């Protein structure tokens, strides 16, 4: 069985732009991951009206853009509820200096919208464990980061990769505490 992965960043960006939706793929993914990590249901469409309200003044999305969002949602659910402890981030992947700046902006967009998504899901952060609170504090600080064009860009690219891995760890920590899980068959009685 082949593993289903996130759609390509540029194709989603083009579709969102052609649908006149003022959201980037990184923002969309951050919002969905945040809502899921905040406890939003994983097996229904409750995320769609929230997405429409937040990104399009309550208006539904065109079917092609919604199909891509559905694909991103499903891949994200599979990653967050799976056993691999892996999380893919939908970030720009352009080469060169401009690509590095776009990647840094994408990380910031993802993190800011992740935090917004948690709020939209109604997360009660005051009830969070110290680990989850620390993860959220780290994400709030990461959202403020940027690339300094006067410093060594090669070194900053390496640091950005470390930041991305830390973002993933923070997201997984928060999701482990607040995120919805698929119903397990272990608690259901066996029918003979």
UniProtKB/Swiss-Prot annotation:
SUPFAM superfamilies: YgfB-like. One of its GO terms (cellular component) is cytosol. It comes from the Bacteria. PANTHER family: UPF0149 PROTEIN YGFB (PTHR37528:SF1). Belongs to the UPF0149 family. NCBIfam families: PRK01736.1. This is UPF0149 protein VIBHAR_03551.
